[in-house]
């Protein structure tokens, strides 16, 4: 499979390559189709999952279990534009709560927060390792990376500079749905930290009457996980930036400043 990668970059085979590799290794293409069509898995994730199946291994990597100190408050940073638009207020809120860890669901806006001194946890699912390498340099990386429980269906990818500071969750205990999503990992991190107050920013939701398939999947995924988390956990999810998710408790971050 490694030999395919330079050819993929040259010829841009897109989603055809996973099918080609699956066929060459007698792996059911129906399963590959479900990865390509039904979920927003990255190309690299799909190829890695196929390679793991070819090699008959559960996963291509394993890391130590997360051992975390408790934290009463946790801030989860999503990928929505509100986490950028209201950054000055968010930064002020963070600095006023120095013991509050920051959990990044995605590294999309991680560079904005690089100078914030609070403990940082980066969720690595799907294409997030690649995004993290693009948006955060080794010099600006301070914190830990967090993976879903072993084994991971789509395999494991971690930036080389984070190899020694990467951990995996023992379990996703609050839901049986979407256990391989970044939101599930972030919410489980809050449980592991024994948080009683969970704040989120950047979970804007998707506007418009007609959503793309990816937007519909992600919107429903987040909605279900928020509901499951609040049903099974005492912590309330407070969104400090505007959000279309009705099951979040919407508050203005400016009231905390």
List each language-model region with its residue ranges:
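Metal-ion/cofactor- or nucleotide/acyl-coenzyme-handling active-site neighborhoods
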Residues: 1-257
């Amino acid at each position: 499979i490694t030999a395919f990668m330079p050819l993929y970059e040259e010829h841009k085979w897109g989603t055809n390559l996973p099918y080609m590799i699956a066929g060459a290794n007698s792996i059911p293409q129906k399963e590959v189709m479900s990865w390509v069509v039904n979920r927003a898995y990255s190309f690299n994730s799909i190829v890695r999952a196929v390679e793991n199946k070819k090699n008959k291994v559960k996963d291509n990597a394993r890391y130590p279990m997360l051992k975390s100190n408790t934290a009463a408050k946790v801030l989860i940073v999503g990928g929505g534009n509100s986490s950028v638009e209201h950054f000055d207020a968010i930064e002020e809120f963070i600095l006023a709560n120095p013991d509050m860890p920051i959990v990044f669901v995605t590294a999309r806006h991680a560079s904005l927060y690089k100078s914030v001194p609070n403990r940082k946890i980066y969720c690595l699912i799907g294409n997030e390792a690649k995004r993290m390498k693009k948006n955060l340099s080794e010099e600006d990386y301070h914190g830990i990376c967090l993976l879903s429980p072993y084994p991971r269906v789509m395999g494991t990818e971690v930036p080389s500079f984070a190899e020694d500071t990467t951990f995996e969750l023992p379990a996703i205990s609050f839901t049986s749905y979407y256990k391989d999503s970044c939101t599930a990992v972030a919410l489980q991190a809050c449980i592991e930290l024994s948080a009683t107050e969970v704040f989120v920013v950047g979970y804007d939701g998707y506007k418009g009457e007609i959503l793309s398939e990816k937007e519909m999947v992600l919107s429903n995924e987040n909605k279900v996980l928020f509901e499951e988390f609040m049903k099974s956990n005492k912590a309330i999810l407070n969104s400090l930036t505007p959000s279309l998710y009705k099951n979040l408790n919407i508050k203005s971050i400016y009231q905390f400043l």
